[in-house]
């Protein structure tokens, strides 16, 4: 496994590819740096970049500037389809704090900060609020 900067992080990661590849349900992946499970769908498109992309494929690939933001977008779509504001209760600060306490690092800086690919929680909250507006909930 490699992070988005091409650094080998295999010893710090669990091998989920085998579960993903053997799952019988539809597989949705969200990626932003090319190294995420599912980015194998666009491996040829990534070959000219100076990264080591994931080769694992998925059924549906959602590419976003920040993977977490792509997940929020997917949740916003589900909110619209089910007419329920699933993002209303999302507590980004608490989530980032918990992840940092457990040893997670920012994907861009590689440091244990309460940020997402270099973006502050405040910036993520703006994205979430905009998604909620687009979904008709703000």
Stretches with model-predicted labels:
Residues 34-138:
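C-terminal functional extensions of proteins
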Residues 1-18:
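An acidic, phosphate/nucleotide-engaging active-site surface
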Residues 14-47:
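Catalytic cores of nucleophile-dependent amide-cleaving enzymes
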């Amino acid at each position: 496994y490699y992070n988005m900067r091409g650094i080998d992080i295999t010893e710090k990661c669990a091998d989920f590819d085998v579960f993903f590849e053997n799952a019988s349900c539809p597989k949705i992946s969200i990626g932003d740096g090319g190294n995420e499970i599912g980015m194998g769908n666009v491996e040829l498109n990534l070959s000219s970049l100076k990264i080591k992309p994931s080769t694992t494929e998925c059924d549906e690939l959602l590419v976003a500037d920040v993977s977490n933001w792509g997940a929020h977008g997917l949740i916003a779509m589900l909110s619209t389809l089910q007419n329920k504001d699933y993002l209303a209760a999302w507590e980004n600060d608490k989530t980032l704090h918990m992840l940092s306490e457990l040893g997670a690092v920012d994907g861009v800086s590689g440091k244990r900060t309460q940020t997402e690919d270099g973006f502050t929680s405040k910036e993520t909250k703006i994205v979430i609020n905009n998604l909620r507006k687009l979904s008709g909930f703000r």
